[in-house]
Regions:
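ABC ATPase NBD coupling module
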Residues: 5-23, 41, 173-177
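Conserved ABC ATPase signature
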Residues: 82-86, 90
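Hydrophobic anchor residue at the start of the ABC signature
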Residues: 96-97, 124
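Catalytic Walker B motif of ABC-type/P-loop ATPase nucleotide-binding domains
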Residues: 107-110
């Protein structure tokens, strides 16, 4: 990151600086939060990490309210609650509220919509795209869903057994694939106008 091997990062101050700049959203929201920390604490930690530890309490509440509002949550309904009291979709939105407060340079989004229903999925994706537009962050979106990759990406990298086998713009890679691996990946996407062969299922 910035020309440095992240494995060499040592000390609390360096780690805090790294995690302020690089954050993640993961596919399982239920394992992404400390079950003993209330939502207020989760959001306050983000403000503190951004250097807002000494802000007045009213200002901190204003920032947390703004972050929750960005993801269509009401802070006053979340205060004194624990993350596990929320639905999966709400927890995923809470993770995005964290990112809104932290404003990292890079966001690693690992299958962030795989465990939520289709309606919530579209909402979460739109929130991520709006957040990218508002903050200018780079989002590295990891997914097995080729249609989703096309929807959210400027550039696409196809990997096979841990190695990059093809990369380019979303249009180049998905609409005009060059390698066997990419062609196979795209051909495996079910098409509603084709008869499916279920004999191998």
């Amino acid at each position: 990151f910035h020309g440095r091997d992240i494995a060499t990062i040592r000390g609390k101050a360096e780690r805090c600086e790294y995690y302020r700049r690089v954050q993640g959203i993961f596919q399982d929201p239920f394992s992404s939060f400390n079950v003993f920390s209330k939502i207020d604490t989760v959001l306050l930690d983000c403000i503190n990490m951004r250097g807002g530890r000494h802000l007045p309490r009213d200002k901190k509440i204003e920032l947390m309210t703004e972050a929750c509002s960005f993801v269509n949550l009401k802070f006053e309904e979340l205060t004194n609650k624990y993350p596990f009291e929320l639905s999966g979709g709400q927890m995923q939105r809470l993770m995005i509220a964290r990112i809104f407060l932290l404003k990292p340079k890079v966001l690693l989004a690992d299958e962030p919509t795989s465990m939520i229903d289709a309606c919530s999925r579209a909402t979460i994706l739109d929130m991520l795209m709006n957040l990218r537009k508002e903050t200018g962050m780079t989002i590295i979106f990891i997914t097995h869903d080729i249609g989703l990759a096309y929807y959210v990406s400027d550039s696409v990298y196809i990997m096979e057994q841990g190695k990059i086998v093809e990369y380019g713009s979303a249009d180049e890679v998905i609409l005009n694939p060059k390698t066997y691996n990419t062609k196979r990946l795209i051909s495996d996407v079910p098409k509603i106008y084709e008869v499916w062969d279920l004999s191998t299922v």
